[in-house]
Amino acid sequence: MARSKIALIGAGQIGGTLAHLAGLKELGDVVLFDIVDGVPQGKALDIAESAPVDGFDAKYSGASDYSAIAGADVVIVTAGVPRKPGMSRDDLIGINLKVMEAVGAGIKEHAPNAFVICITNPLDAMVWALQKFSGLPTNKVVGMAGVLDSARFRHFLAEEFGVSVEDVTAFVLGGHGDDMVPLTRYSTVAGVPLTDLVKLGWTTQEKLDAMVERTRKGGGEIVNLLKTGSAFYAPASSAIAMAESYLRDKKRVLPCAAYLAGEYGVDGLYVGVPVVIGENGVERVLEVTFNEDEKAMFEKSVGAVKGLIAACQGINDKLA
């Protein structure tokens, strides 16, 4: 049986980490693509030379021509520029929209049957644009946000409670940004909701609120520490979890930026919600009930996504 093929568009820090993780988890053969010739080839060779030590047989290649992604089963997109100091949101959108247009055309021509995971920011707008530009079915194009945001929340909670991260579940919905919605009512330690743990004296509401806020600002915290870049280990791990659920038909329930067609009262947008990922891509959207506060937070988050989409449509009339 042929190995799966994973195409990574963008061979920067996240792309290289994705390539290494795909090998370690034996998900398939990997092609790294980047417009800067030499970088994907160099990283591919470096990782291939680590394979004898780690004991995996995946084939690695690098390319700067989209024909190399032909027939990919999974495509993970990290191409684009990060937001730099002094750059406005619209500047970032304008640059990365052009990138998504080129990437979308490449996927449409060479890997139209792939499951596509977008990581490029601003995420909720870029995954929406990528689906439009590629013309792929909405269930085969998703954005990586919620898995990462939930992982950050789980890390903070596990540290606070002094328990294993394995026993902490966290629920983060909405857009990937300051308006994300960490739902404490649906987040648990060994099945016990966080709201109950506050009542039991394990933590205080103030500490819980601080962890929620730290989760919202999680990406920025790392940017401020690194000074020359942004997070790449946790984002790569998060995207690999999504790819693995698709390739192995695990049907994991993962929070992702998924296309909504009426669910949660949202139509035609990509918003972070829990979904089942299996061999058919996004197979189901899980709808949870909100209380009034959660509903207001979610609607605010959706409003922010709508603003990003409007900005995209103002920049590129093909998206209008």
UniProtKB/Swiss-Prot annotation:
Listed EC numbers: 1.1.1.37
Amino acids binding substrate: 83, 89, 121, 152
GO biological process, one term: lactate metabolic process
Gene designation per UniProt: mdh
Active site, renumbered: 176
Binding site for NAD(+): 10-15, 34, 96, 119-121
Protein name as catalogued: Malate dehydrogenase
InterPro entries, A to Z: L-lactate/malate_DH, Lactate/malate_DH_C, Lactate/malate_DH_N, Lactate_DH/Glyco_Ohase_4_C, Malate_DH_type3, NAD(P)-bd_dom_sf
NCBIfam families noted in UniProt: MalateDH_bact, PRK06223.1
Superkingdom of the organism of origin: Bacteria
Pfam families tied to this protein: Ldh_1_C, Ldh_1_N
UniProt xrefs under PANTHER family: L-2-HYDROXYCARBOXYLATE DEHYDROGENASE (NAD(P)(+)), L-LACTATE DEHYDROGENASE
Reactions catalysed: (S)-malate + NAD(+) = oxaloacetate + NADH + H(+)
GO terms for MF: L-lactate dehydrogenase activity; L-malate dehydrogenase (NAD+) activity
EC main group: oxidoreductase
Family statement: Belongs to the LDH/MDH superfamily. MDH type 3 family.
Record function comment: Catalyzes the reversible oxidation of malate to oxaloacetate.
UniProt KW keywords: NAD, Oxidoreductase, Tricarboxylic acid cycle
